[in-house]
Amino acid sequence: LDLSRDEVCEYVINAVSNILANANIEYVKWDMNRQLTDMPRLGYNHEYTLGYYKIMSAITEKFPNILFEGCSSGGGRFDAGVLAYMPQIWTSDNSDAIARLKMQYSTSMCYPVYSISSHVTASPNHQCGRDTSLRTRADVAYCGTFGYELDVTKMSDEEFEEIKAQIKFEKRIQDLMCNGDLYRLINPYETNY
């Protein structure tokens, strides 16, 4: 959709608002890929982004109790302006904990930790096949918004108990992780651990 056009923005605002007003929705992941090449005119990227902000401003004002999460994958949407409408952004579709170390390290150079969506996902990872312990996956996820994206019905009783302990621990450290000072002690680009 050409979000540089007012009539397109109004259409999106109305269509999305209609859905949100008529359903019990508390969370929306706005996974929006955009064309980054072959722009039709000079200034199109800027106009498109302003249209996107217009849409998000209208929708988030109408629905202040819905958590909107942005998504950077494929669309370059992890920008400072988006944080005015979406307090957290999915950093990458690559959810492998080890790969996320570098991504989250780099992202935290420009964005607050509490805006970096980071979840414990299934192992072995569906993108790279790496098998990573539940503890390691949680340790990485603590350094972001922290959540789970896996099928707990496929977990052992022991793993389920570990998840409950991880959630309890995260609740204890949440304020520190979101509002504390961040010191980068090791650069993952300069070491293998």
In which residue ranges do the predicted regions lie?
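Active-site-proximal beta-alpha loop/turn segments in soluble metabolic enzymes
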Residues: 1-2, 36-44
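Glycan-recognition and catalytic regions of carbohydrate-active enzymes
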Residues: 149-193
